[in-house]
């Protein structure tokens, strides 16, 4: 077999076993890329990969800058922020001529019994505020959760003021929880320097007990039957809080996360009161655990938590008319809310001791309310005149939470400096985000070019290598002697190296080695099978000749066997095996016409006196197997 190095051609020479002259066959690969084009393509891939590496470094640097700027903005505004949302009047409610509640962009004024009280907030959402507007103010804190900070979003307020609507919403107007989950997946999909995974858990705190809302055992059972699941609050050496026994599911997309969220909502404890027909009688806590890992080798996984909490409604027993178990539920809710207020107030005042152990709610949120955490509380109030007492109680709670960090406590000059600093940071944030967006677009474009170039390179060069390996065995190799040695892997490697188009980083891939090994095994197996068939035929012919009882036949057979040996000794060619006649004409015609396996078929002898019966052949063949 000859290989043309100029055009990548394989020439098949004339077979030595064929009696007729065979015209040499030429196989030409039309898909071969010229060497200079292959080298140019390889160089282009290398340059593009270097550009991808540089773009990722720039993107990582800008992302770190964005994280720092965002953290400064949130800290300047306050790591614990309090918003207020005023519920609109319902269609069944009578709207008074003079409303008791008036509000501005960051304050609420309550008028009652000839007096007025003013409460300040970081932001006030009016009655006409939409779900999208509320989420717009919450969205930046979600980015902090992806950046590695623990984040806590709480909905607080009197029963019937719209806490559950703000957190859950409806199918037409989704609430904060579904919007936040969707935003997390959107942000994670655009992060080209980190891989992000999410796990989800839901539980409720009912009268001081923990209930797993995503457990497979949850159904329409009574709480006493379903509360047997053991959930224990534990704190590790680093201060991270874990709940032993709590179900945690990995969510791969928003659809699956929304399904689990709806499942947990359906088994939450609710009850009828004078104020609300479906009053929440517990605190519902949804936890999204975020695992963020860099693409660089040796990067560590950052773990952060996002808590979205729909707190039970604060209420006065005289207003709700609760008795029995409903009254006990209300008391338990009020006690845990009071403990939460104490913790937030202590954190805002930066006290040395924070009373986390006063309730299960604050124990669970210990690592999400303290240092490096971001807290956002949404206080809900009613505009009705009948609810003024409960409204004042809710706003007084938030006043404790905001503590001494009221903007009114600052002088006009300090207030202007604070606003100017926030404005400058927000401008820097926009510039950084715009830079990240441009780099991401360019990075995506370059990665597409790299993939296209690599695909072209593999299609052309790898196909040529496969053709060489396949054509290394000539289509007429089966006509050669059975002792011919197949082409070894060393020769194939030399063929590859001599072609000159294989790039340095593809000279020894796993795929090529596997194809090499499989090809060699097939060639060796084919040669071995041909040798075994030839050996069996030799033994078969010998056994037939020895079984003949006629001495004359033995002499004729001996002469017919020794003559080729003498001729072979004189000419230097190997002897031919003894041949016999077979009476089955159809089998004889089939064997004579079969040119693909000349060594495995049985041919006739020129001496008619040494013919054997077909039954003898069958009997001897069965004994060989």
Curated annotation (Swiss-Prot):
Q: Does the keyword Coiled coil apply?
A: yes
UniProt feature, compositional bias: Basic and acidic residues: 577-587
Do you know which Pfam families this protein is assigned to?
Kinesin
Can you quote a single GO CC term? Answer: microtubule
Residues reported to bind ATP? 157-164
Q: Region (Disordered): which ranges?
A: 561-625
What SMART domains does UniProt report for this protein, alphabetically? KISc
Q: Which family does it belong to?
A: Belongs to the TRAFAC class myosin-kinesin ATPase superfamily. Kinesin family. KIN-14 subfamily.
What is the official name of this protein in its record? Kinesin-like protein KIN-14U
Q: Which organism is it from?
A: Arabidopsis thaliana
Classification from the root reads:
Eukaryota, Viridiplantae, Streptophyta, Embryophyta, Tracheophyta
């Amino acid at each position: 077999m000859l290989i043309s190095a100029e055009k990548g051609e394989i020439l098949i020479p004339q077979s030595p076993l064929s009696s007729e002259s065979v015209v040499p066959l030429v196989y030409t690969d039309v898909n071969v890329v010229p060497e200079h084009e292959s080298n140019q393509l390889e160089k282009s891939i290398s340059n593009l990969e270097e550009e991808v590496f540089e773009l990722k470094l720039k993107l990582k640097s800008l992302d770190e800058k964005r994280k720092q700027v965002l953290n400064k903005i949130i800290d300047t505004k306050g790591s614990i922020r309090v918003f207020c949302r005023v519920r609109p009047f319902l269609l069944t409610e009578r709207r008074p001529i003079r409303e008791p509640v008036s509000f501005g962009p960051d304050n609420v004024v309550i008028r009652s019994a000839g007096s007025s009280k003013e409460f300040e907030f970081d932001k006030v959402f009016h009655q006409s505020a939409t779900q999208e507007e509320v989420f717009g103010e919450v969205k930046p804190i979600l980015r902090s959760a992806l950046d590695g900070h623990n984040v806590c979003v709480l909905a607080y307020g009197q029963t019937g003021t719209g806490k559950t609507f703000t957190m859950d919403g409806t199918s037409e107007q989704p609430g904060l929880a579904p919007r936040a989950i969707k935003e997390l997946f959107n942000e994670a999909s655009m992060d080209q320097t980190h891989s992000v995974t999410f796990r989800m858990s839901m539980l409720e705190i009912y009268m001081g007990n923990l209930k797993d809302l995503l457990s497979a055992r949850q159904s329409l059972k009574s709480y006493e039957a379903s509360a047997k699941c053991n959930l224990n609050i534990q704190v590790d050496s680093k201060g991270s809080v874990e709940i032993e026994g709590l179900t945690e599911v990995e969510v791969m997309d928003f659809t699956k996360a929304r399904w689990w969220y709806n499942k947990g909502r359906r088994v939450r404890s609710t009850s009828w009161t004078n104020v609300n027909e479906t009053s929440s009688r517990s605190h519902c806590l949804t936890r999204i655990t975020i695992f963020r890992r860099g693409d660089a080798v040796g990067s560590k996984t950052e773990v952060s938590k996002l808590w979205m909490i729909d707190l039970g409604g604060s209420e006065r027993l005289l207003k709700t008319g609760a008795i029995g178990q409903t009254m006990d539920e209300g008391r338990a809710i009020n006690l845990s809310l009071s403990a939460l207020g104490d913790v937030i107030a202590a954190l805002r005042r930066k006290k040395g001791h924070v009373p986390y152990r006063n309730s299960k709610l604050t124990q669970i949120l210990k690592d999400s309310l303290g240092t490096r955490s971001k807290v956002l509380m949404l206080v809900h109030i009613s505009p009705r005149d009948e609810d003024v007492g409960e409204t004042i109680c809710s706003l007084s709670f938030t006043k404790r939470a905001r503590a001494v960090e009221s903007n009114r406590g600052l002088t006009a000059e300090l207030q202007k400096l604070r606003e100017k600093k926030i404005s400058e940071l927000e401008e820097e944030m926009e510039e950084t985000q715009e830079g990240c967006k441009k780099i991401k677009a360019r990075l995506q474009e370059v990665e597409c070019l790299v993939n296209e170039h690599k695909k072209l390179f593999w299609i052309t060069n790898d196909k040529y290598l496969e053709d060489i390996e396949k054509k290394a065995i000539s289509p007429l190799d089966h006509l050669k002697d059975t002792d011919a040695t197949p082409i070894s892997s060393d020769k194939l490697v030399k063929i590859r190296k001599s072609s000159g188009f294989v790039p340095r980083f593809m000279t020894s891939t796993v795929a090529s080695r596997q194809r090499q090994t499989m090809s060699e095994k097939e060639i060796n197996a084919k040669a071995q099978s041909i040798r075994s068939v030839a050996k069996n035929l030799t033994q078969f012919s010998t056994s037939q000749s020895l079984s003949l009882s006629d001495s004359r036949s033995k002499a004729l057979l001996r002469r017919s066997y020794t003559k080729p040996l003498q001729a072979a000794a004189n000419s230097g060619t190997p002897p031919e095996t003894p041949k016999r006649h077979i009476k089955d004409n159809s089998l004889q015609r089939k064997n004579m016409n079969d040119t693909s396996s000349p060594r495995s078929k049985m041919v006739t002898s020129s001496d008619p006196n040494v013919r054997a019966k077909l039954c003898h052949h069958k009997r001897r063949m069965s004994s060989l197997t």
